[in-house]
Structure formats: structure tokens, C-alpha cells
Amino acid sequence: MAYRKRGARREANINNNDRMQEKDDEKQDQNNRMQLSDKVLSKKEEVVTDNQEEIKIADEVKKSTKEESKQLLEVLKTKEEHQKEIQYEILQKTIPTFEPKESILKKLEDIKPEQAKKQTKLFRIFEPRQLPIYRANGEKELRNRWYWKLKKDTLPDGDYDVREYFLNLYDQVLTEMPDYLLLKDMAVENKNSRDAGKVVDSETASICDAIFQDEETEGAVRRFIAEMRQRVQADRNVVNYPSILHPIDYAFNEYFLQHQLVEPLNNDIIFNYIPERIRNDVNYILNMDRNLPSTARYIRPNLLQDRLNLHDNFESLWDTITTSNYILARSVVPDLKELVSTEAQIQKMSQDLQLEALTIQSETQFLTGINSQAANDCFKTLIAAMLSQRTMSLDFVTTNYMSLISGMWLLTVVPNDMFIRESLVACQLAIVNTIIYPAFGMQRMHYRNGDPQTPFQIAEQQIQNFQVANWLHFVNNNQFRQVVIDGVLNQVLNDNIRDGHVINQLMEALMQLSRQQFPTMPVDYKRSIQRGILLLSNRLGQLVDLTRLLAYNYETLMACVTMNMQHVQTLTTEKLQLTSVTSLCMLIGNATVIPSPQTLFHYYNVNVNFHSNYNERINDAVAIITAANRLNLYQKKMKAIVEDFLKRLHIFDVARVPDDQMYRLRDRLRLLPVEVRRLDIFNLILMNMDQIERASDKIAQGVIIAYRDMQLERDEMYGYVNIARNLDGFQQINLEELMRTGDYAQITNMLLNNQPVALVGALPFVTDSSVISLIAKLDATVFAQIVKLRKVDTLKPILYKINSDSNDFYLVANYDWVPTSTTKVYKQVPQQFDFRNSMHMLTSNLTFTVYSDLLAFVSADTVEPINAVAFDNMRIMNEL
């Protein structure tokens, strides 16, 4: 168009050659302009040669041909994909989809036994600290003194009870409590040692350093530090290390050393650790590495059963656990191999059905959704649902007779309990009213909702034909057998299913049905049912093999389940489409698939780790509930304790667990006994609460309240301070008693009579450097609110110090100001650090190696799958 417009403006006598020449010139000019601008703007350096243009033209020609061929390929690809999509839509209308929740699988697989954590330091609550000494006038001396202080001296802000501090401390001890201690791993060099000796850990070494460098340290102590070293008794595999510990810390660490969970490891233990049924399974060849050192150790997993019975009345918790188990089980069920070609099978089925133009719609429906993906999906769903005891629901179209006939196989091999009742009733009713009753000319069954009997149970009483009634009887009584193996409750399939004999029973019933006259139905209807039965009966051998394969894979993987398989219907269900069951029945080949040994070991390890962690977390929660009860914090902390317990199991979304289940869980946890180690640790804390309170800079042992002013007293540790070191001469009231009774009259009367009163009991106090700012608000903050609100747990007395380190010291020195306060903090002196009393020798094994993965010593292989045999010593797959 542009060319014509330009030509219209020119003279009429311009010939065609000129026009063509002009057009080429214009194109070249434009190209040159573009190239020039590109060259100016580009940062590349370009070497100009004479024949550059010719080379570029040749390159452009090559590029254009390449682009054309690419476009052609893309067109062909999209055409192929489009055809595939159309085929997919035609053949695969109803395929179940499973989206694995990878996050849950990762959480489960990431649960590792906590024994793996290596201790690098001893457990300590206290540390020695160097504090200055103040003279009587508040000036700092050059000397200092050592006291034991708390390492983590943290009290949260807000209304806080010191008893909560002890509960948190106990929780911290439980978290850090080691399963084993190997002192050799944490020992460090003593820098001040004469002969390169070692002390037990880095904190002991740093304390020794600080004491050695302190000018006031006695020569005898320095000489002792220089002599500090380990003492090895090689013949007994024992080593003693010197340590510097507070007596309470020593009691903790000595207890940990005496109650280690490690046990000697030998080949028998590893052999017995492998599930018995896998050891005895002839399809698996297990070999063990026999070179275990004598110092090998392991920690026995804690596999106690059903202490909380989560299947009983914990619907949402049980649903989460079964979902996690289902996702894990699906990841280990083997994929089917060498399935029959979908196209070939559909062609064969079409021939068997003699599909032609006159064929009724119902028979073309038989082929809907048959594909290998659906077959594999169905196989994995059935086994994983049984392993995790997840309830299934069935999706089907009543007019697809092939689906219903496949459903008859499904109901034969999978126990009724595995299906949600509504779905089971709907499927059975469809089979009865579509196939069984019409065959015998019986009227449709009108099923009343809520009937305790299922349609098959009603039909069993009404059907006269022996074979059909016999099959119905089997289905109605098809339940899991509960068998305890190695202390674990297993849900075992019926022997007739395991060996595949039940399929003969099913086929007899189907043959009887196909021979019936269907007197009340048209001929086409009868023919459709007969052809559907024919399709399934043609694959009798493959169905027997499929049933044996399903049972074998289920029972082999079940050997790796460590928690009791409790059967309770789940809140949510796993959907199973009957078209996928048809796919499985029609496409199963003769290739045997069994789980690989590596898969079995992985599945077993994940189950053991989760189960062991579950029991340890129960022990922690039970211990903390007991501690909260004994510290009178029962009401306050209970829901938080249960929430923490669920969080530490990793798989629960705690925010979505209903409150009623939380409190039910608390009630179950309360009934359990406390594990001995955890109880002993709590008793250690309880016996030494006074020492721990003394060592804190934020916990007081009481508060003295008066209306008249009380002068600050001089203290070696702080200077001038409103601290009372004893309560002589004061009327005392116990804080616990006050909180329990809520009777404040006694205190009010004393204060009105100008008598100071001492409230005794552990409580937090506030420290602040500015005395003046505190004195102004002292009465209101410390006690007025308490009397008004009748809440002792908001009581926070204020401590302040005036010494040469504080800004207020000069006010006192210059103006002879005598600071006073209407409250005093009652605080006992912390324990003084004495080197001789703090020196302890700790004893442990010189060396041992802890193995967490016992199955790493086992090398395993399988026989050729084609030779794999089931429990009856016959090949799993017999049909060739």
C-alpha cells in the first residue's frame, strides 16, 4: 500500500525497472540507517572488512531457513499435542488424580532420632561471676569476689509468676537432656596445665583461665589448676575429667552420666531389629556386615503402643495421622510394570463386545477412562489406604455396567470397613438393582436410608441361587483379621483373598448371573451385562494374580508398620473411581512388582523415627503437666503444654485442632505415669529452688512494705541498696497463703498501724539505675494496685542501688542526702564461689560409637520378581 501511494505522486512515465531499483535502494538505505544506529548505540567493538555485507546476507538467508524449519516443527508438535488431548478427552473422562502433599512427606522423613545431636558442653544452670566489693560509703574497692549466678537469668515482662520460671527451666532441661554423654568428645585443652592436660569442656577451661589470671587467687589454687588433667583407665575403657561445676549442676550431669540410654550393639540386635516377616520372606536376600567394633552402641527406639489411643474420639487428630501415613505409604508402594497396552486392550474389548453402529450407548461406555495411569493409581490407592487405614469413597456411574462388575471384584478383595458406609451402600445397591436382581427377574430393591443391613446382606437372604448367595455371604463377612505380630496390631486379609481363591468364587457367581434370563429386561440390556461379565471372566487368571499381588505388597509393607493399625472411619476419605478399578482389572499384565529392600528399610526407618519421637514427646508433655500441677500452675499453662506437644510431632496444624479435642488430650495425658528420668530431674529442681532463686538477679524471696520510710542499707555487693538480708523483727505473711485465701485485711490493718509487713515467697522484681525517678512512683507501683485489685501475681517490688557506679552516688556524697524507701526487697545472698567445693571429677567411657541407622549394616537384594512367591510358596503371578 505504501509503495502504491509513493508511485501515485510520481510521473506516469517511470518504468517498472526504475521502480524496482528505487525500492531496493530504499530498503538498503533503511538497513544502513538501522545498522548505523545499532553500531553507534552498541558497546561492542567491530572490525570492518570489505565483504561484510555479503557475509551478513548469507547469514540472514541461513537464519531465515532455520526459523522456517523451527516453525514447521512447532506446528507439527502442536498438532500432535492437540490430537493427544482429543484422545485424552475421549478415553480418559474420569481419572482419579492424587496430589501428594510433599510438605507432609518431607516433615515425616525429616523426623530424625534426637540421639544424633552431639553434646559439646556439659549442662549448666549456673556460672561463676566476678563481682566488685563496695565500701561502707558506697565506693568500689579494688578487690572483687566470685559468686555463682544464673547463666540465663531471664524473666519475661508482664504479670509473671516465678513458678512459671521454674516450669520453663524444667522444659529447658528436658529439651537439653542428653541421651548419652561422651566426655572425650567435649574435652578441651587446659591452657594452664603443665603437661597439656585436658578438662571436661570449654566452659570449665574458660573458668580456670579467669581464676588463674585473677590477682587474688591463692597460689595453691593456681598450682592445682596447673595439675588439672584427665585420668585414663584404658583397661576398663574409662576416663575421668576434672570439671568446675555448681553442686546442683554436678548433680544434673552426674545423673545424666549414670542414666545414659546407650546400649551395646551387636549383630543379633541388628538382625532382630529387621521386621520378622521380612527376615523370613524368601523373596528377600539379607546379608550382614559382621565387623561391628566392641565399642558399638545404639539407642533403643521407644516404641510403646497406644498410650493416648488417638483413634478414639480424636477425629481431627486421627485424620491428620492417617493422612500422613497414607502419603508416606503411597510413596513406597511399587509402580506396576509392563501393563497391557491400553490401545491393544481397548481394541480387543471392542472385538469382544462386537461394537458396531447399532451398539447401544451403555456398551461404548465400558471403554471410558481405561488407561495405565488410572490402573497404577488404583493399585497404589488401595494398598496405601489399607496400610494407613484411610477410609475410601467410591465414585461411579450406574449406567456403566463394566464399572459395577469391576466394583464386584473390588468389594470381594477389600474389606467392607475400608469404605465409608454411604458410598458402600450406594455401590452395593447399584450392583443389586443393575445386575443381580434383574438377572433373576426380581423387583428393584427399595433401600431405606439408615437400615442397619447393607443391600448385599438383604440380597443374601432373598437370592435362591447357591453360588451368588455364597459370594454375597463372603463379601458381607469380609473383615480384617486383627493379629498381633511383634507386639504390633496388624489388620490382616482373609486367607482366601491372599491366595486368590476367592476370585473363583466371584467368577462362579458372575457365570451364574450371565446365564440367567433377565426376564423383565430387554434383550439389549441382558446382552450388555453378559458382555461385561465376559470381559472380566476372560481375565480370570490375571485377576487371581492381581489379587495375590495386591495382598503380597500390602502384607510386606505392613511388616514395616510400627504403630498399632487401629481401624476407625476417618473424617475425610480417599476417592476411588470405579473406572480406575476397571483399568486395573483390564490392564494388569504378568509382571510381578514387589517393594525393593531399600524402599522397605526407608519405610521402616521413617515409621520407627516418627513412633519413637511420638512417645518421647508424650513423655515430655506428661512430665511438664505433672510439674505444672506441683507448681500450682495447672490451670494457667495447660492448653499451651498440649499445643507444644502437638507442634513437636511436626505433622499437625495446631491452630486448626478443636479445643474440645485439646482438653480431651490433656485428660488422657494426665492419666499417664511420668517417666522415671524426667521425674528425677524435676525432683532435683524442686529440691534446689531456693539456691536457684538466690542466684538470680531478678527473683526476690519476698518484699517488706511499710508506710513509714525505711533507710537504705549498706551492702558489700551493691553499695547503698533497699535490700533486706534477713526478716528479723518483721511480721511475716506467706505469699502463697495470701494468693490462696485472698484475705488482705491483715496487711491493711498492719499498714494503718504503721507496722511494716514482710510478704515472703519467690517473686520477680524490677531493677533500675535511677533512684530519683523510682522514688516518685514507688508506692503506687509496688503495693497500692495490689490491695486494690487483690492480685498478688502483679506484685513487682523495685530494687535500686547507689554506689560509685551509679549517677546518684554523687548526690549522696555531696549533699548528705539519706535515701529512703517505703519498700525493701528481701533477697538472700547467692552462694559464694569456692574453687575447692566446685571441683568435681566426672567419669564416662573412654570411647564408644553410637549408630543411629542400624539397617546401614544390612545389604539386601531380591530374587528376580518373576520368581517371587507368596505365603503359600506359589509364584505371586502364575499367569504367563
From Swiss-Prot:
Residues 19-30 have a biased composition (Basic and acidic residues). Coiled coil: none annotated. Keywords: Capsid protein, Inner capsid protein, Repeat, RNA-binding, T=2 icosahedral capsid protein, Ubl conjugation, Virion. GO terms for molecular function: RNA binding. Homodecamer; each decamer is made up of two conformers of VP2, called VP2A and VP2B. Interacts with a VP1-VP3 complex. Interacts with the intermediate capsid protein VP6. Interacts with NSP5. Interacts (via N-terminus) with NSP2. HAMAP family: Rota_VP2, Rota_VP2_A. Belongs to the rotavirus VP2 family. This is Inner capsid protein VP2. It comes from Rotavirus A (strain RVA/Cow/United States/WC3/1981/G6P7[5]) (RV-A).
